[in-house]
Design a protein with these regions (language model features):
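A short beta-strand-loop-beta hairpin characteristic of the jelly-roll/cupin
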Residues: 1-21, 111-138, 148
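Ligand-binding loop in jelly-roll beta-barrel domains
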Residues: 14, 18, 27-53, 137, ...
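Conserved hydrophobic/aromatic beta-strand scaffold that supports enzyme active sites
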Residues: 14, 22-24, 45, 95-99, ...
């Protein structure tokens, strides 16, 4: 949830989701949701075809980013990682929030083949894409989405 409040249902369970809330539904699960307030709610919805690993399966996961363990990304004090999904072979992906303090960055330029992207939750910064520095900021920039970034304005 980016803002607002919704009521979501999946696998016979009901979830009240507010800012920072999330719900992962495994393959074959039906999810429904309705706005639970008079004002608009803003959600980030991501759907992709599941790639199974024999002998493993994902399960329904729900929570709130405010309750997740804050991990110092690659040992850096100025970059915090919040992982939404378990690090289990049944999950063929992850969603997470990276929070960058002013002046912080990855320790290297990312080069990998995984599907990757960003939705800017707050702040502004620059993103190196194919050796081009692209200005990014909240609500204006959306690189093909799989990773959520929180950039703190200086």
């Amino acid at each position: 949830m980016i803002s607002g409040n919704i009521t979501a249902k999946a696998e016979g369970k009901t979830f009240a989701l507010s800012e920072g809330g999330y719900l992962y539904c495994p393959p074959g699960s039906l999810m429904t949701f309705v706005n639970a307030q008079a004002e608009d709610s803003q959600i980030f919805l991501y759907k992709r075809r599941y790639v199974p690993v024999e002998g493993y399966a994902p399960w329904l996961v729900s929570g709130n980013a405010s309750e997740l363990e804050r991990i110092h990304y690659e040992g850096m004090d100025d970059v915090i990682l919040l992982d939404f999904l378990p690090k289990e072979l049944g999950f063929d992906m992850n969603m997470h929030i990276l929070s960058f303090a002013p002046g912080a960055s990855h320790g290297y330029i990312e080069t990998h083949v995984q599907e990757h992207g960003a939705y800017i939750l707050s702040g502004q910064g620059v993103y190196n894409l194919d050796n081009n520095w692209i200005p990014v900021k909240k609500e204006i920039t959306s690189l093909w989405a799989l990773v959520l970034y929180r950039l703190v304005m200086a």
